[in-house]
From Swiss-Prot:
Cited SUPFAM superfamilies: NagB/RpiA/CoA transferase-like (SSF100950)
One GO MF term: glucosamine-6-phosphate deaminase activity
Gene designation per UniProt: nagB
Organism from which the protein derives: Staphylococcus aureus (strain bovine RF122 / ET3-1)
InterPro entries cross-referenced by the UniProt entry: Glc/Gal-6P_isomerase, Glucosamine6P_isomerase, Glucosamine6P_isomerase_CS, NagB/RpiA_transferase-like
Single GO BP term: N-acetylneuraminate catabolic process
Enzyme class: hydrolase
Xref: PANTHER family: GLUCOSAMINE-6-PHOSPHATE ISOMERASE
GO cellular component, one term: cytoplasm
Protein name from the UniProt record: Glucosamine-6-phosphate deaminase
Pfam family, one: Glucosamine_iso
Record EC number: 3.5.99.6
Length: 252
């Protein structure tokens, strides 16, 4: 597991955007696992700049989002469909829509939708890179504490802490969906390479637990210790004291 403090959200996001760009440039049929939320805004902004500057052919790139709120239509401003369109797919409108995969949070039968999305993941095979954030309680995707390590795509009851943390995106806390559809922990670990981003003081405790705690369902992110190729990029505020700062221009 590689852990790097790149000083700021902007610097870390730029570095990871370059990694995604290089993957798409050198592997035009690559499969990318994507994440959403406040952590990822600079990442997509930087990635869009790189894509527009170089007019990269992404017609054969496939994307797979981690999760979606249950009960929100794709057109809802707080849905992750809407987020991905606003942050990436409308900013660089050359991704092939048939290769964009995001769970449907407004399906009539959500358990059937979870099974359907899991089938897509299995049929498409390993993602080349999986992008992750981390919740204040150590969740990855929407896999809350207590989620079995062998879980696949499923419907999640969101914890009070997750609802409270996400309420800043809604008019009030009561508007935050109480459930989500999420890749399971087993799905996440199927990726060839995992890149986790964490920014801000509120994420420091979760990162500290991830790095120092034994593998436990109480902190789902600790499962990443079982994966052979994990990279964690932090800013100063999220970084535990024992992780040294490094500048992007010092990296390979």
């Amino acid at each position: 597991m590689k852990v790097l403090n790149l000083g700021s959200k902007k610097q870390a996001s730029f570095y990871v955007a370059c990694e995604l760009y290089k993957e798409m440039a050198f592997n035009q049929h690559c499969k990318l696992g994507l994440a959403t939320g406040g952590t990822m805004t600079d990442l997509y902004e930087q990635l869009v700049k790189l894509l527009n500057k170089n007019q990269l052919n992404v017609d054969n790139v496939s994307t797979f989002n981690l999760d979606e709120y249950v009960g929100l239509t794709a057109s809802h401003p707080q849905s992750y469909h809407y987020y991905m369109d606003a942050m990436l797919f409308k900013q660089y409108p050359y991704f092939n829509r048939k290769n964009i995969h995001i769970p449907n949070g407004d399906a009539d039968d959500m358990n059937a939708e979870a099974s359907k999305y899991n089938d897509v993941l299995e049929q498409q095979g390993q993602r080349d890179i999986q992008i992750l954030g981390i919740g204040e309680n150590g969740h990855i995707g929407f896999n809350e504490p207590g989620t079995p390590f062998d879980s696949v795509t499923h419907i999640v009851d969101l914890t009070e802490s997750t609802i409270k943390a996400n309420s800043r995106y809604f008019e009030n806390e009561d508007d935050v969906p109480k459930q989500a559809i999420s890749m399971g922990l087993a799905n996440i670990l199927q990726a060839k390479r995992i890149i986790l981003l964490a920014f801000g003081e509120k994420k420091r405790a979760a990162i500290t637990h991830l790095l120092n705690q034994e593998i436990s369902v109480d902190v789902p992110a600790t499962l990443l210790h079982k994966h052979p190729n994990v990279e964690i990029y932090l800013d100063d505020e999220a970084c535990p004291k024992n992780v040294a700062k490094i500048h992007v221009d010092e990296m390979d």
